[in-house]
């Protein structure tokens, strides 16, 4: 493998794009056309950068990935960024490793709020962008309008004149072609490679100084343990070299580097020596944390810690206490759940976990509902069982005043739904900032809304727009609290009054009371929520009742039982649906919704105490 690297031929670049604007496909094509793939393996899996099952399913990138491409003697390190503000912790770290950003924007949609979030961070780091207008071949593409939108966005984000003088490349990643004009695309991606080489500066580093690097990502491997990934700030590193590790508190310890791993395509390979400016992985240093500095034993200097946005949403993770606990999951105890959460903390820097006075409950805080639901979904797939409460926003005391988080929301809906959506957002204390009709029957709305107004809104929004609306949000700022309750659920729920098998006959009778959430012949337990009541109060119902068979020849004997299809919630929908006195029970097999207090008597008693305390 190559040992020497000409620093002037090295380029480090991060890719920024909104969900579904074609970032992952673009990287796939760059890897193929640079010939990097032929050397590692024959055929290429679609979406090679998304390595986690959840990422492939949802089409979102959660964890940042690294890959390297060799093109005409140049070596280009490409780091993928999560496009979603909920993963702000990941974004910060990626930007500390690169010298420029590649902003991929859809030729029809234009820049979206999640792109805005990452771009803002990139400008704050002083990085200069290269803009790729992707999907220029799609019907309705309007590349010139998109370029204007991008320019306006950059001006709004306070870009410098240098940053505003950005090169534009037009591309169709799916077909693997790019060009400097959208009417004239080259045969392949060469114009994009040339733009990267020409406009991205090589890393400004000192090759002869003592070694220093900061860990900005962690990986784990059963054979070598913790792997630290980062960009070498100065100097060079070899396997077996003794180093000093400085953690966030400034404590130092000695260590010896195991392997030094470089990236090529999606593979890692061992190097004999790595130089400043390159992005590498090193093993053999035991427990590492993000932001640790690794340096030469004779020049112990810590690099400034990486800052991460504070969490804005918190929820409780509890041990599953339902009557069906332990039937479907492998890990069910509080110790196992806490161990898993602590393991997550190692690389998920925007997460916080606090123990509570109740040993079976942990307070977990993150950057948003998506951030936390991805963690819950991952735990569920690994065989964990747990119950989670409704998300609540985190208030802050700023200058003696209590403040709450606000989000910037972009909504894209058909004109016929505009009125009802605006009314619903008004009730949730949203303020309109902008309104852009696209002239083709759709409208884009920009809002600033308190984060608590968004909790539970997505499901309602999808129903309101019959699934045709798009809703994107990203954290904006903290500000004074808006008075009044926001976003309470309008409907009550149907609650099972006993444990057993739900029978079709009983469910048939309950259909007129509301929408059911379970199929016939499913096991339910007392206190489980089996449907949505059509009125605003909760109703405890019997869904185990069979048909009485005494009057065999009664006239109603042959009425066929027809059950409507039940409402099935995904994990996110369930978390958004529940109220403060309810929990979502999450197991590897099922997602159930239940009341915190399972018996009707307990609920009535709790209700009485809350009413009496509120009247006194």
What do these predicted ranges mean?
Residues 1-105, 109-111, 149, 218-221:
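P-loop NTPase switch module centered on the Walker A-proximal segment
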Residues 14, 133-140, 177, 181-185, ...:
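Conserved short loop/turn motifs at secondary-structure junctions
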Residues 20, 26, 59, 80, ...:
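Residue-level signature of catalytic and energy-coupling elements of molecular machines
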Residues 74, 98-101, 125-129, 163-166:
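Short glycine-/polar-rich loops that comprise or flank the Walker A/P-loop
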Residues 110-126, 147-150:
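Amphipathic helical hotspot of TIR/SEFIR-family domains
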Residues 128, 138-198:
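Canonical P-loop GTPase G-domain recognition
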Residues 165-167, 194-198, 202, 228-264, ...:
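Accessory interaction regions appended to the cores of large information-processing enzymes
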């Amino acid at each position: 493998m190559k040992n020497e690297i000409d620093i002037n031929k090295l380029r480090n670049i991060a890719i920024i794009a909104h969900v579904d604007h074609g970032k992952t496909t673009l990287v796939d094509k760059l890897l193929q056309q640079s010939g990097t793939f032929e050397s590692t393996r024959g055929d290429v899996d679609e979406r090679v950068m998304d390595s986690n099952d959840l990422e492939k399913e949802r089409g979102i990138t959660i964890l940042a990935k690294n890959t390297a491409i060799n093109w005409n003697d140049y070596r280009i390190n490409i780091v993928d960024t999560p496009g979603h503000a909920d993963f702000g912790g990941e974004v910060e770290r990626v930007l500390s490793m690169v010298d420029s950003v590649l902003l991929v924007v859809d030729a029809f949609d234009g820049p979206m709020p999640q792109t805005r979030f990452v771009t803002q961070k990139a400008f704050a780091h002083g990085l200069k962008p290269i803009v790729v207008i992707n999907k220029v071949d799609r019907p309705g593409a309007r590349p010139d309008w998109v370029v204007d939108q991008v320019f306006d966005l950059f001006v709004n984000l306070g870009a410098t004149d240098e940053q505003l003088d950005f090169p534009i490349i037009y591309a169709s990643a799916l077909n693997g072609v790019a060009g400097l004009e959208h009417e004239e695309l080259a045969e392949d991606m060469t114009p994009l490679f040339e733009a990267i080489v020409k406009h991205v500066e090589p890393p400004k580093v000192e090759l002869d100084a003592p070694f220093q690097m900061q860990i900005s990502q962690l990986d784990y491997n059963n054979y070598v343990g913790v792997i630290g990934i980062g960009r070498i700030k100065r100097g060079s590193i070899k396997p077996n070299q003794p180093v000093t590790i400085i953690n966030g508190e400034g404590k130092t310890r000695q260590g010896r580097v195991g392997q030094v791993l470089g990236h090529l395509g999606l593979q890692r390979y061992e190097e004999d020596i790595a130089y400043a400016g390159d992005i590498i992985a090193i093993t053999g240093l035991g427990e590492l944390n993000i932001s640790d500095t690794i340096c030469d034993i004779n020049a112990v200097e810590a690099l400034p810690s990486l800052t991460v946005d504070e969490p804005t949403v918190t929820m409780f993770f509890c041990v599953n206490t339902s009557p069906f606990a332990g039937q479907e999951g492998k890990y069910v105890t509080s110790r196992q759940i806490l161990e898993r959460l602590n393991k997550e903390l190692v690389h998920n820097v925007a997460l916080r976990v606090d123990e509570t006075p109740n040993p079976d409950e942990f307070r977990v805080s993150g950057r948003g509902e998506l951030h936390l639901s991805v963690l819950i979904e991952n735990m569920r797939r690994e065989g964990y069982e747990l119950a989670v409460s409704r998300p609540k926003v985190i208030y802050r005391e700023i200058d003696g005043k209590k403040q709450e988080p606000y989000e910037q929301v972009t909504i894209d809906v058909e004109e016929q739904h505009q009125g009802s959506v605006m009314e619903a957002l008004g009730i949730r204390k949203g303020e309109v900032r902008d309104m852009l009709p696209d002239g083709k029957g759709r409208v884009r709305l920009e809002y600033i809304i308190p984060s608590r107004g968004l909790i539970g809104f997505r499901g309602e929004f999808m129903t309101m727009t019959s699934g045709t609306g798009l809703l994107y949000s990203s954290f904006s700022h903290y500000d004074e609290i808006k008075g009044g309750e926001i976003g309470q659920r309008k409907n009550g729920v149907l609650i099972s009054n006993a444990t057993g098998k739900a029978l079709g006959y009983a469910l048939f009778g309950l259909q007129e009371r509301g929408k059911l959430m379970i199929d016939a012949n499913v096991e339910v337990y007392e206190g489980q929520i089996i449907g949505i009541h059509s009125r605003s109060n909760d109703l405890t119902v019997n869904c185990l009742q069979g048909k009485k068979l005494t009057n065999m020849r009664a006239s109603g004997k042959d009425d066929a039982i027809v059950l409507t299809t039940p409402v099935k919630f995904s994990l996110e929908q369930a978390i958004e649906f529940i109220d403060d006195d309810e929990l979502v029970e999450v197991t590897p097999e099922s997602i159930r919704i239940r009341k915190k207090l399972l018996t009707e008597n307990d609920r009535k008693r709790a209700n009485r105490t809350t009413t009496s305390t509120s009247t006194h």
